[in-house]
């Protein structure tokens, strides 16, 4: 890693120096400490210390497309510049979350676009900002999904992603997604989570308390009993062709950055990392801004 990586992370010497044990360090020593220890320790190092700080980076004056807002849109849904997209209609979403006490049904947003087959050609608008919170991990084919988002992004537009860090959420025990997983999904042209993805999602989860995960209290899973309990039901459901939602990918900031960089080098996407904000202590998400570039750029 180099100074350019510090710029990618939006590193601030002044912010990082506020820690008592770092106050007397030089700029060079701060940079070394951040790269060696600070990222792993989840220290605050810049202007983004939480979700609100990240959202506040967004210029909301232009057209905005929010992916999967469910019942918690991050922007004014009444604005004429606001659009949303989901793989389910509002009615389907209400039905899907009927027994979930954490979802306020009356607040579920009516999607401007309902697209479950990766065909974004129906979208004629071009957006200055695309915002997606905890959706990228659901996308059956990361390459196709990123290209779809790029296809409706204005030339100087930006894609803002809030992504769960698999180390600190209920995905802790699942294998980290690598570039080979991503390329295989692209080769298979997956348009919905595979049966295996759904089974793993339901049977390999643990608790979702980020503080406990940061303290290395990861809980345990009982995959066998859950698998036996759900297998037949899921198989019957999957055979009907219905879209069964699941986490398909499991990222860390480092793995996601490497995947995006490799996909761009392979000329499979025309997006690059503009900024990346590492997971901070007590949180289970990191933030990424993607920008559009020429495929040979």
What are these regions (language model features)?
Residues 47-59:
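Class I SAM-dependent methyltransferase Rossmann-like catalytic core
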Residues 1-50:
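Charge-rich, low-complexity intrinsically disordered regions
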Residues 56-59, 122, 268:
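Structural motif
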Residues 62-172, 288-294:
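Conserved SAM-binding loop
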Residues 24, 129-140, 246-250, 277:
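Short, charged/polar micro-motifs that form catalytic or ligand-binding hotspots
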Residues 103-120, 144, 148, 158-294:
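S-adenosyl-L-methionine-dependent methyltransferase catalytic module, highlighting the catalytic core
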């Amino acid at each position: 890693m180099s100074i350019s990586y510090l710029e990618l992370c939006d590193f601030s010497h002044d912010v990082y120096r506020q820690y008592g044990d770092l106050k007397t360090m030089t700029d060079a020593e701060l940079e070394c400490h951040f790269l060696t220890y600070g990222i792993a320790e989840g220290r605050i190092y810049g202007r983004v210390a939480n979700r609100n700080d990240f959202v506040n980076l967004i210029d909301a004056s232009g057209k905005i497309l929010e992916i999967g807002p469910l019942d918690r849109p991050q922007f004014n849904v009444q604005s004429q510049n606001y659009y949303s997209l989901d793989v389910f209609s509002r009615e389907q979403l209400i039905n899907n979350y009927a027994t979930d006490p954490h979802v306020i049904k009356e607040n579920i947003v009516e999607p401007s676009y309902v697209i479950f087959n990766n065909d974004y050609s129906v979208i004629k608008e071009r957006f200055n900002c695309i915002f997606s919170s905890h959706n990228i991990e659901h996308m059956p084919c990361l390459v196709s999904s990123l290209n779809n988002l790029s296809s409706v992004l204005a030339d100087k537009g930006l894609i803002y992603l809030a992504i769960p860090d698999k180390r600190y959420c209920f995905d802790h025990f699942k294998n980290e997604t690598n570039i080979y997983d991503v390329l295989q999904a692209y080769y298979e042209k997956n348009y919905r989570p595979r049966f295996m993805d759904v089974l793993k999602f339901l049977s390999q989860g643990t608790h979702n308390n980020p503080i406990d995960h940061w303290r290395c209290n990861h809980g345990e899973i009982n995959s066998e009993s859950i698998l036996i309990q759900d297998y037949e039901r899921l198989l019957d459901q999957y055979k009907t062709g219905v879209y069964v939602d699941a986490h398909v990918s499991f990222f860390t900031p480092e793995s996601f950055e490497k995947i995006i960089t490799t996909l761009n080098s392979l000329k499979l996407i025309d997006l690059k990392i503009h900024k990346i904000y590492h997971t901070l202590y007590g949180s289970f998400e990191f933030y990424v801004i993607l920008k559009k570039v020429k495929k040979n750029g």
